[in-house]
A protein has these predicted regions:
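Short, internal active-site loops enriched in acidic
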Residues: 71-76, 111-114, 197-206
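C-terminal edge-of-domain segments
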Residues: 108-133, 219-256
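Extended repeat-based interaction scaffolds and adjacent low-complexity, acidic/S/T/P-biased segments
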Residues: 2, 6-7, 14-21, 35, ...
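Aromatic/basic-lined ligand-recognition segments
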Residues: 78, 82-144
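A solvent-exposed, charged loop/short amphipathic helix patch at secondary-structure junctions
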Residues: 148-165
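Accessory, usually C-terminal, subdomains that scaffold auxiliary metal cofactors
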Residues: 185-234, 248
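Generic N-terminal amphipathic, Lys/Arg-enriched alpha-helix
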Residues: 27-37
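Short, well-ordered alpha-helical segments
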Residues: 47-72, 77-87, 160-192
């Protein structure tokens, strides 16, 4: 994920990563990224239908979709996560978003601890729109405390299975570093963010000031979701974005 690629059909750059998502996206000059959040989680199939309608109503091609934020009922096993990802990616392929098995779409996928959806659902999505004289906009994919690569997530996770205050701090430090790495590759930093989100059921207060605020990650505040990363055994996830347009839609019914 060290080389920034271009996805011309969508008018954005991206950081190549794994087959189910990229590391982050940034709009081309002359375009910006718009985020649309569903008021309530929408089941995956219905969500894709809603996204198709919203994007087409905006006069944009489906290839303009550049990020998805998902909510799942509970953390997956490695095998279950792989099966879910294959189903999810199938729609992206139909929309012309996957080229030679390279996925340019950013993503986060987390599991609310309280009142989760019954099925995997959409929380929000992003797509590019034409824009004049706006600051560059971007979305960084969610990352937990496990490096991308081969082998199981448990083999790659920071202090896997540990939930002490010290372990959660170390996991957070790793994830913050990964956010900074992805931001830097796309030409951004914390000062460019307008939203930073944390996903964990563990207490962040012991390291909030010195690990998060002090490094500039909370300049626009923080949104803490009481949720788990999408894989069993992972405890801490973050994502971030720098956007001007952030809307809420009432299209589609809730996933309950």
């Amino acid at each position: 994920m060290s080389i920034v690629s271009e996805f011309t059909p969508g008018s954005y750059r991206f950081l190549p990563s794994v087959f189910q998502y990229c590391g982050g996206v940034a709009a081309f000059t002359g375009f910006e990224i718009q985020r649309v959040r569903f008021r309530n989680p929408v089941p995956l199939g219905d969500g894709f239908d809603c996204i198709k309608e919203i994007v087409r109503d905006a006069g944009r091609p489906l290839t303009a979709v550049c990020a998805c934020e998902l909510r799942s009922p509970a953390p997956f096993t490695d095998e279950g996560f792989r099966a879910f990802n294959q189903s999810y990616v199938a729609t992206l392929q139909k929309w012309g978003l996957i080229d030679n098995a390279v996925n340019p779409v950013a993503r986060s996928n987390v599991c609310p601890k309280i009142n989760p959806p019954k099925v995997p659902s959409f929380h929000a999505f992003c797509f590019t729109v034409e824009a004049i004289r706006v600051k560059p906009t971007f979305v960084i994919s969610g990352s937990g405390e496990a490096a991308e690569g081969s082998g199981s997530y448990s083999e790659r996770a920071v202090r896997h299975g540990e939930t002490s205050a010290d372990a959660i701090r170390e996991k957070a430090r790793y994830v913050l570093g990964e956010m900074e790495r992805r931001l830097s590759l796309l030409g951004f930093g914390w000062s460019d963010t307008t939203a930073v989100q944390i996903y964990t059921v563990h207490d962040i207060h012991p390291f909030l000031a010195d690990e998060i605020v002090q490094r500039g990650a909370a300049q626009s505040g923080l949104t803490w979701h009481y949720a788990r990363p999408p894989l069993r055994g992972l405890e801490y996830e973050m994502d971030c974005a720098g956007l001007r347009l952030d809307a809420v839609t009432d299209m589609c019914g809730p996933a309950r």
